[in-house]
Amino acid sequence: DFIGPYRDIPAPDVYTNAQVMAWIVDTYSQLKGYMVPEVVTGKPIPLGGSLGRDTATGRGAVFCTREAARVRKMTLKGASFAVQGYGNAGSNYAEILQELGGKLVAAADSQGAVLSKKGIDAVKLLKHKEKVGTVVGMPGTEKISEDELLRTECDILVPAALENAITKDVAKGVRAKVIVECANGPTTPEADRVLDANGVFVVPDILANSGGVIVSYLEWVQNLNRLRWTEEEVNTKLEDKITRAFSDVHETSQKEKVSMRTAALIVGVGRVADAIKTLGLWP
C-alpha cells in the first residue's frame, strides 16, 4: 500500500480537484471491501469532505497576511495587493482580503495579467475568468505581462501559481512591502537573499499556504471519528492553528535574527527533533 489513512493521505493540487479525490476514494474502498473516506482529503461533501476545505488555502494565507500586517505595522484597509495565479487559492485569497478592506490592483493567470490602480473587484474578476477562460479582458483593466505584475507597486504581492516565479532578476524589481507565498516554492533561493537584503517581508510557503493542509488534517480527523463540523467551526480551528504557527515562526525569526523562511524550518525541524529525542532509542 502506497497510500492509506495511516500511511500517506493525498489531497488536491494543480490539475486535480474534489472529483479526482472521489475517484481515489471509490477505487481504494473497492479494493478494501468497505468505505474508507479518510484515505484522501479535499473530497466532495457527500463523501465526507470538510466544509471550508475549498477556501482553506486562500483563507489561511489571508490570516497570515493579517498577522504580517500587524507585526509590520500596516493596515489592511486600503492595502493594495497583486495576485499572480488566479486559481482556487489566488481567487479565494483575493475575495477574502477584499472583504477585509484590501484593494486588488493586479492579477494574472496562465493567459496573461491585468492591472488597474483604481482597483479590481475580485468577485467580478473570477466571474469574468469563468466566462471567458482568463482574467485578460476584464473591463476597466489594462493588459500587462506577468513580469510587470511581479514588479507592480503594491503593499502585498501574492505568488499563487507555480514554483520559481520570483527569480533573482525579478526580485531586484519587486516593489511590494510584503510577499505572501500562496504557491509552493515560488521564490528561488537566490531571489530570497535579494528580497531579504531589500527589506521585503516574506511569509514563506511552508507557513502561508498551510491552510489547505491544516483543513485537510481537520477533514481527516472528522472522517476518522465520523464527525461533521460546521464551516464556522472549521474556519475557527484554522484561524487558531495558523495564527499560533505564525506567532511561533515570527518569534523565532526575531530571537534568532533570521528570515521567516529559516525560522519556519527551525520551528518545524525542532519539533520533529524533540519528538525523536523523547522517543528514545530502540532496541
Language-model-derived ranges and their functions:
Residues 7-11, 34-40, 106-109, 158-159, ...:
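General beta-strand structural signal in soluble alpha/beta enzymes
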Residues 7-9, 45-53, 204, 254-258:
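A short glycine/serine-rich beta->alpha loop
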Residues 1-49, 274, 283:
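N-terminal ligand-binding/catalytic initiation module
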Residues 112-202:
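Rossmann-like adenosine-cofactor binding region
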Residues 3-12, 34-38, 73-80, 253-265, ...:
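Flexible, glycine/charged-enriched surface loops at secondary-structure junctions
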